[in-house]
């Protein structure tokens, strides 16, 4: 494949970030089709070589988890089993392909072109979010958000209702604030794979996350920035040579945290408030998780989640919730202790990376691998191609840039 065609192919990645939630068509009630529905085919555009062994390992793990869920899970709604299982298998295929593919290398002289497209995407979505927030402040509603919602995979009516009661959230081109923040962090990590400092873009992405009103997004950005500060400056060589710079950068960061502290403290307080989004995402579902880990009938088959969640009577606002907004909890409900052991194994790998990253965290390596488990706390829609794209895109670029560590 020629260089020009290769570049056009990789320029698809920032474009997909703009279109990831735009609905092309609909199959049934719960299967919207978007550009990332065709992600396995799109990955072939970047393919140089594939390890069949790795792909078979990934598919084997997916098949084992599917069999476990079918054999030990209780079925509460058999009509949705096939669709839900297909989504899980699809995610396994996407992750397996990204892990097993050797991607075509992006030549250095083309880095700037791809980065410009990413900068353009960031500028567009953050500017749109700013316009939405301005309209919300001035009018108490958002006709812009309502108009965009008609073209998205899911309705954001609950966000619009939240705004009517005085809330301030934005979604830009995405179906919910948390997914908007998740997309911005994914873009941020994609840009960081190019190994350059982008303070203006960092500031714009942080502004977008704040405009989204996503507490998970704000805390993740703070965590990732603190980690990078620690990796850069908490080693003997850096302390000797860069101590003033380290103190100045930390001071500036802490000023930002102090300014944001009222918001952070309010959202932390919401963890104990039944009916709040924070409570529903983190605290409320713990009773379900505990039941899944301690009872034989605690595992739920694919497609039966709504009925299982509703049976616990946990309120999300004024209504009893029927969904799980926490991906880790969802995995435990579907796979019980397998999800726990796999999560602990993965986090063990990340912790080893952290220990060795002081003074050598090349291109945000630790943050990239930490992004996968952290992203589980943003949404329960983890068995969707849209979520999968946000997770794998930075990895695709890292491999295409030949970053081996």
Spans of features found by a protein language model:
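Transmembrane alpha-helical segments and their membrane-water interfaces
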Residues: 41-47, 76-133, 346
